[in-house]
Design a protein with these regions (language model features):
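Extended polysaccharide-engagement surfaces of secreted carbohydrate-active enzymes
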Residues: 2, 196-469
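Extreme N-terminal leader/anchor segments
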Residues: 2-15, 19, 23
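Aromatic-lined, polymer-binding surfaces characteristic
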Residues: 3, 23-186, 198-201, 208-222
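Short amphipathic alpha-helical segments that mediate assembly, nucleic-acid/protein binding
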Residues: 18, 59-62, 95-98, 233, ...
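Type-3 copper protein
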Residues: 188-191
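Beta-strand-rich recognition/accessory modules
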Residues: 449, 458-501
Length: 501
């Protein structure tokens, strides 16, 4: 199926992508109803997509998917919440068939916001079929728990004290359609934050676990569309269409779009930004389902809202005409925190990633580890700094870190056409260690100055700089490392335009 980017309505464009995905899933489905690569919930969301799009055309695929789900062994990793949600979106699926598939499988209910919200929404969907007052009370208590544990206006934690724009977007998308007014009020506040994160560049998902992945992008697209943020939604949809043109599908990682290898995973350089639980067919079916929902519910644009107040929040967003920078200031894992800001240079759909999200899978072999974090390290490469605390005062972020028992500090100041990064520590070591996206051409003009000619950006330091090209990865793929070697202090100014101060 050919795909052309045209100035048609978002509903039509979303429908076209959903149809593309539906056809691809039909081709990828095996005779037994499963998919080529192991998946957790692809059959359920694929069946929902097919049943809503064209139940007659895809009848054999729908039946095969349901039969596969009936035959599936319910292991401890059985994604009950996701499978149930997909099944409940299939028009006309009888309760007997639903129960035959789910059987007595327990819910996972991890201490993660999106799973908790999904479980609550599933319970709401079951209430429509005549559940009693006890379940309504349980849902009310569950919502109180979710708000207390995960909601910190205007954002949802992923896990307590950890932010992920991907799973924030999923929570907002789920609550947007809730029949409960209290849920929709929270969804509106959460979506306003997504509008700020997305801007006009179309990258809605750059902070925290799952950065860059299609899962968060389609959820953000749905919530933004439903709430009338059409400028932001249009830019996200453009990114999805562009990725589809480049790869012929919707890749799992939209900030590293490429053909799917036979062995995708977190350790494969061809699939950067993946986690051990990521599955191409899960995310493809999930994306198709949300895109079709967008096509089915067109909305009118709304006036720009009042920007969310982030003064006390754990994330920081700095937007100027030259760039947008995003930071997450708390968390427990490498992918939670941003010791170097995620920076987008320029505006609109021509925006370029300068500094991509860093960190990644930690519970399985992966491309990521302590060495891949953009913080100082000892000159021999044996020890790497760890963040102790991050805080923000107006346009300045301070990060306290410890390296081989020695305390140090990074200060990042954001101005209209300049970002200044200063590292200080009471020992000679390798400072900065910033990871510049591989698409950015970087030229060393003097020992203390670098130039990105295509972006009009100059890196000016008061110490010597080195460009290290060897085997570094961000969530967007390979990167060049900028290092101030063997020093105890460095100030780097990243300047847009012709500022020679």
């Amino acid at each position: 199926m050919s795909l052309l980017v045209t100035r048609t309505s978002m509903a039509e464009r979303s429908q076209r992508l959903a149809r593309l995905i539906a056809d691809q899933l039909a081709k990828r489905q095996k005779p037994d109803g499963t998919f080529d690569q192991h998946s957790f919930y692809a059959p359920a969301f694929a069946a929902a997509l097919w049943a809503q799009l064209d139940p007659a055309l895809y009848a054999p695929q729908i039946e095969a998917a349901l039969s596969a789900l009936e035959a599936e062994q319910q292991t401890p990793r059985y994604h009950r919440e996701f499978i149930e949600h997909g099944l409940r979106q299939i028009p006309g699926l009888c309760a007997e068939r639903l129960n035959a598939i789910l059987r007595n499988a327990p819910t996972q209910s991890p201490d993660v916001a999106n799973w908790q919200v999904l479980g609550m929404i599933n319970r709401h969907l079951s209430l429509k079929k005549g559940a009693g007052k006890n379940r309504k009370l349980i849902n009310w208590l569950h919502w109180a728990f979710i708000r207390l544990r995960y909601w910190r206006t205007p954002l949802f934690w992923d896990r307590p004290t950890c932010f992920s724009s991907q799973y924030h977007a999923f929570c907002a998308a789920l609550l947007t359609d809730s029949p409960e007014a209290a849920h929709r009020i929270i969804a509106d506040k959460a979506t306003t934050l997504m509008a700020k994160l997305s801007g006009d560049h179309g990258y809605a998902n750059l902070l925290g676990r799952g950065a860059g992945q299609s899962f968060g992008e389609v959820c953000a697209l749905y919530a933004l569309t439903k709430h009338g943020f059409h400028t932001q939604a249009d830019a996200i949809l453009f990114r999805l269409e562009t990725a589809a043109l480049m790869t012929g599908t919707i890749p799992l990682n939209l900030i590293s779009p490429a053909d799917l290898p036979s062995d995708p995973g977190p350790a494969n350089p061809k699939t950067p930004g993946w986690y051990s639980y990521n599955r191409h067919d899960d995310y493809l079916a999930f994306a198709g389902y949300w895109l079709l929902k967008i096509a089915a519910t067109p909305t009118e644009p709304r006036p720009p809202p009042k920007p969310p107040n982030l003064k006390a929040a754990s994330i920081a967003i700095f937007s100027t005409l030259a760039y947008q920078a995003q930071m997450s200031l708390c968390g427990t894992h490498s992918f939670d925190l941003t010791p170097c800001p995620v920076v987008l240079s320029g505006s609109g759909t021509t925006t370029t990633l300068l500094f991509a999200p860093t960190g990644g899978e930690e519970d399985a072999p992966s491309l990521y580890g302590p060495a891949s974090i953009p913080l100082p390290a000892t000159s021999d490469g044996k020890y790497f700094a760890q963040i102790r605390k991050a805080s923000r005062t107006k346009n300045t972020v301070r990060i306290n870190f410890k390296l081989a028992g020695v305390s140090g500090q990074r200060t990042i100041t954001f101005e209209d056409t300049q970002i200044t990064i200063t590292d200080k520590i009471a020992a000679k070591c390798n400072l900065l260690r910033l990871l510049v996206h591989h698409d950015v051409k970087l030229v060393q003009t003097t020992k203390q100055q670098l130039h990105a000619p295509d972006l009009g950006i100059t890196f000016k330091a008061d110490r010597n700089l080195v460009i290290d090209e060897t085997n570094h990865f961000t969530a967007a793929g390979s990167a060049r490392r900028v290092v101030a070697p063997h020093t105890d202090h460095v100030t780097l100014r990243i300047c847009w335009g012709t500022d020679d101060v």
